[in-house]
From Swiss-Prot:
A GO biological-process term: very long-chain fatty acid biosynthetic process
Effect of deleting the gene: Embryo lethal when homozygote.
Expression by tissue: Expressed in green siliques, flowers, inflorescence stems, leaves and roots.
Protein task: Beta-ketoacyl-coenzyme A reductase required for the elongation of fatty acids precursors of sphingolipids, triacylglycerols, cuticular waxes and suberin. Responsible for the first reduction step in very long-chain fatty acids (VLCFAs) synthesis. Decreased expression of KCR1 (RNAi) leads to plants with fused vegetative and reproductive organs, and abnormal trichome, epidermal cell and root morphology. Cannot be complemented by KCR2.
Residues the record lists as binding substrate: S191
Protein name: Very-long-chain 3-oxoacyl-CoA reductase 1
Transmembrane spans: 13-33
Organism whose genome encodes this protein: Arabidopsis thaliana
Family per record: Belongs to the short-chain dehydrogenases/reductases (SDR) family.
The UniProt record lists the keyword Lipid biosynthesis: yes
Keyword Lipid metabolism: yes
Main location group: endoplasmic reticulum
Subcellular location: Endoplasmic reticulum membrane
Length: 318
């Protein structure tokens, strides 16, 4: 009763502030507990329930290679798709030496070349197989930060062709097989550059292409969820790979192996996710900052990358 009397004696504006503050605190605590459950307690799906075969594009280096080893460890057979036959053989031999029971098929496909011919080979390779998982990992970025007017036509074409057209057409080739069996999982590799930060200056075409992948995936997630197909876009930030040109992993920079292990725990859940929890933490910090503050920092960082890239280019010419 005393509490009720106390509240009644307070001005209306103070009561409104109290209610709004309580809601904000409750929302923060709920988000924190939910995130803890998702990243540390939620069980992963049994990936073999989708099927016994998995397709991975871009499996010869970095994240794609780590995905291949993780899936082989979980007992799935692999169809590896990349442009370099020698690298495909090397990664296949490495996987077989560690997981001798794994069946591996390879498809040579240049995503910057004749995509339709490559897609035709993929269709032929999956005929009669219960392909349950597709990981659209093949992608490319800029060699270094550039103003949009400095980006040459070849780079623009390749960025769109590999990141957009390749992902779209490979998905369209594999999806009918999954629909027949009414089960499957499609994982498209997006980027935090398109989903976790306000803008990604000096990488505009790359960010735009990955934004397409993100929205494309969300639409497919809604279209095919009732058909038993789980479609997901994963949006990491920094991973130590050749594409990012980051050599060493750290707390905020995932190793390919660390990322792939975390990523597979998220398959079958959200339409969009950031599996490596330090990346999600970075995204939360960025979203809490005023856009102008983050953009000021990011522009300085990108201009430093651009300066180093131009210096390397000039040294090559000499």
């Amino acid at each position: 009763m005393e509490i009720c009397t106390y509240f009644k004696s307070q001005p209306t504006w103070l009561l409104i502030l109290f209610v709004l503050g309580s809601i904000s605190i409750f929302k923060f605590i709920f988000t924190l507990l939910r995130s803890f459950y998702i990243y540390f307690l939620r069980p992963s799906k049994n990936l073999r329930r989708y099927g016994s075969w998995a397709i991975i594009t871009g499996p010869t280096d970095g994240i794609g290679k780590a995905f291949a080893f993780q899936l082989a460890q979980k007992g799935l057979n692999l169809i590896l798709v990349a442009r370099n036959p020698d690298k495909l053989k090397d990664v296949s031999d490495s996987i077989r030496s560690k997981y001798s029971q794994t069946q591996i098929l390879t498809v040579v496909m240049d995503f910057s070349g004749d995509i339709d011919e490559g897609v035709k080979r993929i269709k032929e390779s999956i005929e009669g197989l219960d392909v349950g998982i597709l990981i659209n990992n093949a992608g490319m970025s800029y060699p270094y930060a550039k103003y949009f007017h400095e980006v040459d036509e070849e780079l623009i074409n390749n960025l769109i062709k590999i990141n957009v057209e390749g992902t779209t057409k490979v998905t369209q080739a594999v999806l009918p097989n999954m629909l027949k069996r009414k089960k499957g999982a499609i994982i498209n590799m997006g980027s935090g550059a398109a989903a976790l930060i306000p803008s990604y200056p000096f990488y505009s075409v790359y960010a735009g292409a990955k934004t397409y992948v993100d929205q494309f995936t969300k639409c497919l997630h809604v279209e095919y969820k009732k058909s038993g197909i789980d479609v997901q876009c994963q949006v990491p930030l920094y991973v130590a790979t050749k594409m990012t040109k980051i050599r060493r992993a750290s707390f905020l920079v995932a190793s390919p192996e660390g990322y792939a292990k975390a990523a597979l725990r998220f398959v079958g859940y959200e339409a969009q996710c950031t599996p490596y929890w330090p990346h999600a933490l970075m995204g939360a910090v960025v979203s809490a900052l005023p856009e102008s503050v983050f953009e000021s920092f990011n522009i300085k960082r990108c201009l430093q990358i651009r300066k180093k890239g131009l210096q390397k280019d000039s040294m090559k010419k000499e």
